[in-house]
Structure formats: structure tokens, C-alpha cells
Regions:
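Ferredoxin-like alpha/beta domains used as RNA- or RNAP-binding modules
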Residues: 1-5, 12, 22-82
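Short, charged beta-turn/beta-strand-edge "cap" motif at the junction between a beta-strand
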Residues: 14-17
Length: 82
């Protein structure tokens, strides 16, 4: 499995279907994602790998805050063609 940490993904299932999220950490079959608004960094969402579609964009999660995360996702979704 490739490293997904820091990668922007699009949700393909669930209430957040169609939204962009950032993978904070991953294990063998799940990813833990946040978007800074609905899912803050303090309470990550656990999603199955089959319910997310990875993009080619990777961000640095080292000094990430909820505000920075919201801004990055908004810029990405405005510039993407999904």
C-alpha cells in the first residue's frame, strides 16, 4: 500500500460523498480523514479505503491547523475539475 498520509482524497460514499478530505493517517484498510469544518483534526473520521478516491495532491500535515486545512481544501476544490 502506498503512503496516503497528507494526500487529498474525495469521498465516494457516506454523508460526505463528493467532498474533499485530507488523510491524516492510514492503516491497512482504513484512512483517518479531516476537512477542518465537519471533521476537525481533533476528531478524525475513519473511512474505508474503498470509500475514498485519492488525488495526486499531497500536503504537509506537520503544522496543520483546522483553519489552514479549510483554506487548502477550498483552494483545491476551486482549482480541480472533479
Amino acid at each position: 500500500m502506498e503512503s496516503l498520509s497528507g494526500r487529498i482524497v474525495r469521498s465516494c460514499a457516506g454523508r460526505d460523498k463528493g467532498n474533499f478530505l485530507v488523510v491524516i493517517r492510514a492503516d491497512e484498510s482504513f484512512v483517518y480523514v479531516a476537512d477542518g469544518k465537519e471533521r476537525k483534526l481533533a476528531s478524525l473520521k475513519k473511512k474505508s479505503l474503498k470509500h475514498v478516491k485519492p488525488t495526486n495532491t499531497v500536503i504537509d500535515t506537520e503544522s496543520l491547523t483546522d483553519k489552514k486545512l479549510r483554506k487548502l481544501i477550498a483552494e483545491f476544490s476551486a482549482a480541480s475539475d472533479f
